[in-house]
C-alpha cells in the first residue's frame, strides 16, 4: 500500500484554510482534512468548498462524531467528504450506524482513537464492525 500524506486544516477561517490547502497540494499532499475547528466555524460548507477546489483529492471531514452517527455521516457525504471521522469513544451502535451510512453513501469511515482508554481493543472491535480506517491521533492540548 502506498503511503498517503494528509494535511489537517484546523483553522477557523476558510480563507486561511484554502491558502494552506493549496500550498499542501502543491507540495504533494494526497488527503485534505476539514478539521473540527474549521467545520465548527464554517459548517459543512468547508467540505463543499474543498471538494469543489480539489475534486481529485480525498477530502476528510473530521466530524468527531459521538452520537447521531447516521445523520452526521450522511451530512458529511452530501457535502462531498470521501472520509468522515467517528470517535472511538462513541457507542458500538453509533459506530455501526456510521459504517452503514458509509456503505450507503459510498465513503469511508475513519475511527479516531484519541484519548480512548483501551485503543487496541477498540481498534480490533472497529475492524470487526467494518470501520475502514483506524486513526491514531495525539491531542494537541
Language model feature labels by segment:
Residues 1-70, 126-129:
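Conserved N-terminal beta1-alpha1 strand-loop-helix module at the mouth
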Residues 68-141:
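Conserved anion-binding
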Amino acid at each position: 500500500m502506498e503511503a498517503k500524506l494528509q494535511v489537517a486544516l484546523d483553522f477557523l477561517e476558510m480563507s486561511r484554510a484554502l491558502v494552506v490547502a493549496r500550498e499542501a497540494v502543491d507540495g504533494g499532499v494526497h488527503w485534505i482534512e476539514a478539521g473540527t475547528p474549521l467545520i465548527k466555524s464554517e459548517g459543512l460548507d468547508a467540505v463543499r468548498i474543498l471538494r469543489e477546489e480539489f475534486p481529485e483529492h480525498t477530502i476528510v471531514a473530521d466530524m468527531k462524531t459521538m452520537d447521531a452517527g447516521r445523520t452526521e455521516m450522511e451530512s458529511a457525504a452530501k457535502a462531498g467528504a470521501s472520509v468522515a471521522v467517528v470517535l472511538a469513544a462513541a457507542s458500538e451502535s453509533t459506530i455501526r450506524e456510521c459504517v452503514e451510512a458509509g456503505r450507503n453513501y459510498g465513503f469511508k469511515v475513519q475511527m479516531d482513537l484519541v484519548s480512548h482508554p483501551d485503543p487496541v481493543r477498540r481498534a480490533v472491535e472497529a475492524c470487526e464492525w467494518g470501520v475502514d480506517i483506524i486513526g491514531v491521533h495525539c491531542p494537541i492540548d
